[in-house]
Amino acid sequence: MPPRLASVKIPYDWGRKGPFRFWRIFCQSRAVGWFLAAACGRAGRFRTQPAEWPTPDAVFSPLGLALFQDRHDGASNGTARLPQLGTVGQSPYTSAPPLSHTPNADFQPPYFPPPYQPIYPQSQDPYSHVNDPYSLNPLHAQPQPQHPGWPGQRQSQESGLLHTHRGLPHQLSGLDPRRDYRRHEDLLHGPHGLGSGLGDLPIHSLPHAIEDVPHVEDPGINIPDQTVIKKGPVSLSKSNSNAVSSIPINKDNLFGGVVNPNEVFCSVPGRLSLLSSTSKYKVTVAEVQRRLSPPECLNASLLGGVLRRAKSKNGGRSLREKLDKIGLNLPAGRRKAANVTLLTSLVEGEAVHLARDFGYVCETEFPAKAVAEFLNRQHSDPNEQVTRKNMLLATKQICKEFTDLLAQDRSPLGNSRPNPILEPGIQSCLTHFNLISHGFGSPAVCAAVTALQNYLTEALKAMDKMYLSNNPNSHTDNSAKSSDKEEKHRK
């Protein structure tokens, strides 16, 4: 080396001042760091799992400083030694692994823990004393080796924190063969586990013993299969075997969750009564079930209006919780199935009361006689009287057949569910009409038809009077015949 160049000494802080100051500023610039990080793929925009963008100071500043320090330290032997990089960035970057191009016998690769999985130790397993029927055959089980980068000292420290050993693969929750099912605590009747609990149970009753089912107290109920009734499996124990035997069970071994449909759900004040005579009507569980079932399928808002529940912030939720207690299901966001009428707001007790009062008014206050006389005067022609009388008689007979049919209606109403008399086809149609009208329909129609029958009766009487007035001879003949009959009867 020429003496001129040999006398030149490279200062220690050449990267901090001098011609290489621009290089240090260039490496520490944030824009250049972002550009180089994106070019290297560290912060790819379209990657499925984008990594965190590293700060330029963490990526380039130690590298630039270490580069010039290495040139200063390795000027004599010409070898680039980069292990000093860890000393430069030791304070802010202690977790960075040391870089070295020379083989090291004590080198251990960094440990990257797997994704977090909850670990349950075997000592805390309450079913460890029970033979696992779903466990794999140990002869065919493939043991998984430990991670090569797991130090023994770190394993002992981690085991103290997690109360388990990560080296046992069969204890991990992800590899536990019993994770897909659970045993119910009811099966463990004694301290001996399943041995004493399942020994007394038949095989066909095992599915029923798994679930918690409350015992049925009323054995004489008969509930139709409706969608609003919650259903559950029947618990066939010895204590309630007699009670369950009398309950109708369908093919799926399910029964209605409503224990007593005749139980009073709430009392509702009437809408149509005056303030001086306010009356309350009792609403049974069966009536609430009919409001939630077809054809109406009322939602929580409409049902709350029928039951006169005050509007509140959590009114729908509280109503659903109250219905859940009696075994009725009212899903949130339900849409009504039928059009809302004025009869929808009436409970069945008030609707029947209204129909009864309507029938009483039709029976006592309808002007059947005045209407009959008025219409008969419009048909005073003697040639039409015979034909008209026959028409009135035929109409009266048809009305009688119609009222007799409605009298045989056995639709469920209130807490009564009578046995049907009519055929199922016509009875289902009448039941639909009564469910829509809350029990007002059939009695109201009967009251109206009864008023029509009263008109027909008065019309026939008026026609007889008109016929006798137009034919006085027939009247005298009839009177003579009647007098002769009376004399014969006296003799």
Swiss-Prot record:
Cross-link Glycyl lysine isopeptide (Lys-Gly) (interchain with G-Cter in SUMO2): residue positions: K231, K238
Residue(s) carrying Phosphoserine: S293
Keywords: Activator, DNA-binding, Isopeptide bond, Nucleus, Phosphoprotein, Transcription, Transcription regulation, Ubl conjugation
Polar residues bias spans: 468-481
GO terms classed as biological process: bone morphogenesis; cellular response to iron ion; embryonic cranial skeleton morphogenesis; embryonic forelimb morphogenesis; eyelid development in camera-type eye; inner ear morphogenesis; kidney development; negative regulation of apoptotic process
InterPro entries referenced in this protein's UniProt entry, alphabetically: TF_AP2, TF_AP2_alpha_N, TF_AP2_C
Keyword presence, Nucleus: yes
Localization, UniProt: Nucleus
Region (Disordered) residue spans: 74-161, 468-491
Residue span of region H-S-H (helix-span-helix), dimerization: 334-464
Pfam families for this protein: TF_AP-2 (PF03299)
GO molecular function annotation: chromatin binding; DNA-binding transcription activator activity, RNA polymerase II-specific; DNA-binding transcription factor activity, RNA polymerase II-specific; DNA-binding transcription repressor activity, RNA polymerase II-specific; RNA polymerase II cis-regulatory region sequence-specific DNA binding; transcription cis-regulatory region binding
Record motif PPxY motif, residues: 111-116
One term under GO cellular component: nucleus
Compositional bias per record (Low complexity), positions renumbered to this chain: 119-128, 142-155
Assembly information from the UniProt record: Binds DNA as a dimer. Can form homodimers or heterodimers with other AP-2 family members. Interacts with WWOX. Interacts with CITED4. Interacts with UBE2I. Interacts with RALBP1 in a complex also containing EPN1 and NUMB during interphase and mitosis. Interacts with KCTD1; this interaction represses transcription activation. Interacts (via C-terminus) with CITED2 (via C-terminus); the interaction stimulates TFAP2A-transcriptional activation. Interacts (via N-terminus) with EP300 (via N-terminus); the interaction requires CITED2.
Task of the protein: Sequence-specific DNA-binding protein that interacts with inducible viral and cellular enhancer elements to regulate transcription of selected genes. AP-2 factors bind to the consensus sequence 5'-GCCNNNGGC-3' and activate genes involved in a large spectrum of important biological functions including proper eye, face, body wall, limb and neural tube development. They also suppress a number of genes including MCAM/MUC18, C/EBP alpha and MYC. AP-2-alpha is the only AP-2 protein required for early morphogenesis of the lens vesicle.
Domain-related comment: The PPxY motif mediates interaction with WWOX.
Family: Belongs to the AP-2 family.
Protein name: Transcription factor AP-2-alpha
Native source organism of the sequence: Ovis aries
